[in-house]
Every structure is written in structure tokens, then in C-alpha cells.
Amino acid sequence: MARRKRQPVAGEIAEETRQTILRVAEQLFMTYGYRAVTTRQLAEVCGLTQPALYHYFADKEEIYLAVVSEEIAKIHLALERIVRRADTVSERLQAVAGFLLSRMHYDLNLMLHDVRYEVSTKTRDKLDIQFRQGFIVPIAAIFEQGIQRGELRDVTQGGMAAFPAAYLFMTMLSGFATRVPLNATPRDLQAYQAASAETCVRILLHGIARSHG
């Protein structure tokens, strides 16, 4: 006798619906920005009524917080794996840069603008903490290891401390993320990301001045 297919329980259906909302919200927020997206629009794309949407999230800001928090958590796991590699500082920073550029399928500056100006202070403070823990802490660990191993100069030698260096790295990288070639093929995009990662790290570690001597 054939086994009957197990029917999903209410909790599973609820979680599936929640993930659908987050997936759709990510696409809309990262394409149009926080202000331009409405809960009515979100509900329609998800095939829900607005009251049904509010069953899962209290308001648009709570949805945005959940979307960005999930993205930061995913990126943090990947960065931690790169940190644990036995490569040089330059190699690991290039790996970080290449990975982050490949994940920036949305306008990073748009997201940073939304976090700074469109959400409440409470939500902004939460995301600032998550950004520091998810992005900056693992990247700073690479710089700190480089200082400890003698690959990088410390502050007393004219270098930078690990955390300021990590923030500088992210600032430089965001500039490359906003200059992706228009109508690029997947192969072109991959080549651009690899070249940009190498250029970003090379300039960060060695500067743009001609060497003397």
C-alpha cells in the first residue's frame, strides 16, 4: 500500500510563508529602496492580503530589519570561513573582496542610505551592531593577524589598527560595487569582480604612489 504524502503542519506553512515574504522583500528593497516599497505592494507580490502580511510582521520596518539581518548573518558565516584560511593577508582580503562583490547584487549605497536615513534610530542601532559583528569583526581579524605576523605595520610603525583598517577596506570596496559595467554578461561580471578585488586590496596595502629606490 502506498504511503500517504505527509501534509505540512501549520508551523511549516507559516515559516514557508515568512520566508517567501522575506525573499520578495529583499528583491524589492534592494531594487527600489526602502521608501519606495509599500506593504500593499509586498502583500500583492506574495499573494497575501495586508492583514495576512501583518500576521507575520508588525510593519514595513520590521520586515526590512529581518531582511538585512538575514543577509548579514549569511555573509558573516562565509567571512568566518575565509578568516580561518592559512593564506596571506592579501590573499584572504582578495577572497573577502571577491565574495562581497559577488553578493552585491543590489545597490550597496542604496542600502546604506536606507539604514542611515529611512529607518528609526532603534532599528539603525540594531543594524549598526549587526554590521560591525557580521562584516567588520571578521575582516578586522585578518588585519590583526597580519599585524601579529609582521605582514602589516602596526600603528607605531605608521600603519593602522585592525578595526579602522577594516572600515577603510569596506569603504573602498563599496566604490567598486557601484561601478559595475552596464549590461555585463555573467563572464564579464565575474572578471570585473576579480579585477576589482585585486585592485582594491593592492591599493589598500601598497597605495598608488610610484615606488622609489
In which residue ranges do the predicted regions lie?
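Helix-turn-helix
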Residues: 2, 9, 20, 24, ...
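Short coil/turn segments at alpha/beta junctions that flank glycine-rich nucleotide-binding fingerprints
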Residues: 31-35, 85-86, 107, 149
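Residue-level recognition of oxygen-bearing side chains
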Residues: 59-62, 88, 157
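Secondary-structure edge/capping motif, primarily at the C-terminal ends of alpha-helices
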Residues: 82, 111-119, 180-184
